[in-house]
Amino acid sequence: MRPQWFDTAQPAKGASPIADLPTDGVAVLVGDATRGLQWIVTVDDSNGHLMVMLNVLRGDQYLSGSGFDGSKYFAGTVLQEWRGRTDDLPWFVMARTAAAVTRVVATTDLGTDVELTLSPFMSEFGSRFAAAGIPEGECPCAIRAERDGVIIDTSPQPVWTCPPAPFGLGF
């Protein structure tokens, strides 16, 4: 399956191609990764904040999920991002961006640029959403947001070394 986005948010529970996820919210982005994995980005704004989750599945089996919670409004940035992994799964990156962003790219420890699948602007959340799996054996070290080829925001490598230990970080 090619990565896809939804022009409108889709229910996260019981809607094809989305398996029943242990999360509330709506699906905004879906894509495939290595080893038969599928990722689904869901968004929930029912608590007055915006909870953005990346869920990983293999077929109908839910494997893992994690994400971030924050204000519905951007404060001094156009990029909010998350990167993580668990156990034997590859790294994943996910971002929430302002409408002006036209491209999101993660650069790995080996110098590979991975372009994230980017949703259209979703007015109900005031954001665009992006996600991608990172190639096997590589780790996301920097993430940048671009507008028409010009970098407008970056999120450098966190304080941990790249690649960090697989346990205790991410999912």
For the regions a language model picked out, list residue spans one by one.
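Solvent-exposed, non-transmembrane segments of extracytoplasmic/periplasmic domains
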Residues: M1-P90, D153-T154, V159-P166
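Ser/Thr-rich low-complexity repeats and stalk/linker segments
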Residues: T86-W91, A98-F171
